Amino acid sequence: MPKLFGTDGVRGVANEDLTPELCLKIGRAAGEYLKSYGDTVLVGRDTRLSGTMLEAALSAGLASVGLKVERLGIVTTPAVAFLASREDVAGGAMISASHNPVPDNGVKFFDNKGYKLAESHEEQIENYLEKELSRPTGTDIGKVLPENNKLIENYIQELIDKYPLDLSNYKIVLDCAYGATYQIAPRLFKKLGAEIIPLHAENRGEKINVECGSTNPELTSRTVVEEGADLGFSFDGDGDRIIALDEEGNQVNGDKIMAILAKDMKSRGELKNDKLIATVMSNLGLKLALKELGIALEETKVGDRNVLNRMREQDCVLGGEQSGHIINLQDNTTGDGVLTGLKLMKVLIDTGQSLKQLASIMEELPQLLVNVKVSNKDSAINSQKVQEEKSKVEKQLGSKGRVLIRPSGTEPVIRVMVEGENRETLHEVANHLTQVIKKAAE
């Protein structure tokens, strides 16, 4: 059987790649692994139309090996991680494909400390798929409980207790991407007194991430300016990413958010080892800004799992990705868009500065990211011609530029990132590399 788990759980087109039959098997196999840590598993989902179907299958699989299933309903991925670490449970499961297109869905698991399962543990689950597993009967069969919204309220209240901010002087635009934050984010910020302008804050799984959210924050940007808001937050479909918009509608991406938070945490003596963990996709401007602050930047491969693993290895508390995954181990074990928004608001209040002023800490070098759709990622990545052209472009860009070419871990695309001083040149070289990659993948 081919490897099932990718860089962020199991993903595919729902009812085609990720079928109910497969989810049932995954539930049984994951349940066999998790039940040595407890008798209950939390299960959440985003708003995707396939979510209830896959939730039913996964829950049935978990119950069939004797586990009790506590259904959270529509909830963010970080809320599942948070609750898995707080409740007396074996772990948690989230049914979501994050920022992926509408037809996709996925399943990822968390242990009872709230961390995504390590690759070795996912391999154990895959091994269980091939084995005959226990089939309890009678009163030993697990139960699938009705949805429990109280646990979500517990999550919201714990965030408020940790950050009891007075936001009554702030007007905030919230883009919930028709996804999992559509209830949680508006409810939390309203409870703290903010005036909220919600966008895409409905349970519309057929439109999740479509021209909205953290990957498409343009409407949020315009709305901030038109409504005279102080700032805006755009989340992705499962709520683990955030892109902020300042009072003039300018994007404040993950790099700038990390710079703002790192400076604030260092000033409080909370930035362990004065170090931040980010990926190779982060802008060179982040490294330069942190150097001025006496903060070291260590880079990893792309993926929030890689960031988290390095954070734990290096005993760091802050890390993330340019895309808006921000991990702060003081508060949660995975990227949490709503929590990151709260932390940004705290810095605004404490400093009395606007988001634009705070974001000026970092000057970005022009950077261009192109997603090249291909049918064969391996042939493109391993192509000698692609590597030769990449080297030529790197020489052309010089010491203040760089090129990254890598396969997506979740989509059939090759990501090309070029960075340098001249945007026109970047477009030229990106277009050139795109054509070379497409030809190599034929």
Curated annotation (Swiss-Prot):
Catalysed reaction equations from the record: alpha-D-glucosamine 1-phosphate = D-glucosamine 6-phosphate
Mod. after translation: Activated by phosphorylation.
E.C. numbers: 5.4.2.10
CDD domains (alphabetical): GlmM (cd05802)
Modified residues (Phosphoserine): 98
GO molecular function: magnesium ion binding; phosphoglucosamine mutase activity; phosphomannomutase activity
UniProt name for this protein: Phosphoglucosamine mutase
Gene: glmM
